[in-house]
């Protein structure tokens, strides 16, 4: 499959590219805002580069694409306007294009708390509301999907064992971006993850094993 990675230049996006290169099972198309970002991602292992912007025209990014991983985000520290533009409306635009281009699978990187943003700390509500709106839009779109909601992210290396549940009993732990990327990739092909929404955090199981028992 040719996998379009939206948010390819972010920490998780870079993890996705390097892991997919190591797996050598899929082609990767990295979507970037600037050509120079693409040069760096080519060195990291991206097979193709497409320059496009969530806030502008991106229809050409979906040419000859089989599946999409949406790992873009404005970050929880940006203001509401930017968050809505990227995390909500940008995601919706990508979902619409996925549908019109008959994309086989759309994997969304969401966040723990997106199911109930109203109970989150006030400074996080705009971010989680945008994530919730994007998730719900994807679920109603008719595009085959997986929505992955990690706990707080860390940059720890080689920490790839996880716990995956529809609703985690303990949401206070962190999870490495490396483990998140591994989960997003596994979700592309595992039937247990198709049309599912689940939360992940650090744990004791390999990703593929954990995804078999999310319920």
Residue ranges and their predicted role:
Residues 146-165:
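Flexible, glycine-rich beta-alpha linker
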Residues 91, 171-186, 196:
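Substrate-positioning beta->alpha
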Residues 190-210:
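Core catalytic loop region at the nicotinamide-binding pocket of NAD(P)H-dependent oxidoreductases
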Residues 3-24:
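N-terminal Rossmann NAD(P)H-binding glycine-rich loop of SDR-like oxidoreductase domains
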Residues 156-162, 187-196:
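Glycine/proline-rich active-site loop of Rossmann-fold NAD(P)-dependent oxidoreductases
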Residues 30-100, 188-189:
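NAD(P)H-binding glycine-rich loop region in Rossmannoid oxidoreductase-like domains
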Residues 77, 112-119, 153-157:
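Conserved catalytic-site region of short-chain dehydrogenase/reductase
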Residues 6, 11, 29-31, 82, ...:
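Conserved Rossmann-fold NAD(P)-dependent oxidoreductase catalytic core, especially the SDR/UDP-sugar
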């Amino acid at each position: 499959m040719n996998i379009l990675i939206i948010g390819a230049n972010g920490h998780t996006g870079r993890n996705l590219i390097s892991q997919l290169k190591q797996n050598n099972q899929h082609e990767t198309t990295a979507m970037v805002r600037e050509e120079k970002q693409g040069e760096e991602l080519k060195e990291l292992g991206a097979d193709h580069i497409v320059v496009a912007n969530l806030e502008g025209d991106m229809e050409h990014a979906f040419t000859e694409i089989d599946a999409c991983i949406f790992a873009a985000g404005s970050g929880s520290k940006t203001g509401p306007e930017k968050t809505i533009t990227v995390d909500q409306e940008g995601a919706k635009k990508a979902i619409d294009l996925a549908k019109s281009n008959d994309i086989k699978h759309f994997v969304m990187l969401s966040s723990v708390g997106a199911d109930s943003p109203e109970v989150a700390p006030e400074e996080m509500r705009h971010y989680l509301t945008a994530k919730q709106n994007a998730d719900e839009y994807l679920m109603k779109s008719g595009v085959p999907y997986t929505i992955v909601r990690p706990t707080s992210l860390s940059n720890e290396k080689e920490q790839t064992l996880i716990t995956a549940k529809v609703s985690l009993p303990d949401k206070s732990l962190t999870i490495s971006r490396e483990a998140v990327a591994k989960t997003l990739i596994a979700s592309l092909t595992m039937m247990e993850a198709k049309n599912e929404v689940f939360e992940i955090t650090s744990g004791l199981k390999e990703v593929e094993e954990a995804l078999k028992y999310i319920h």
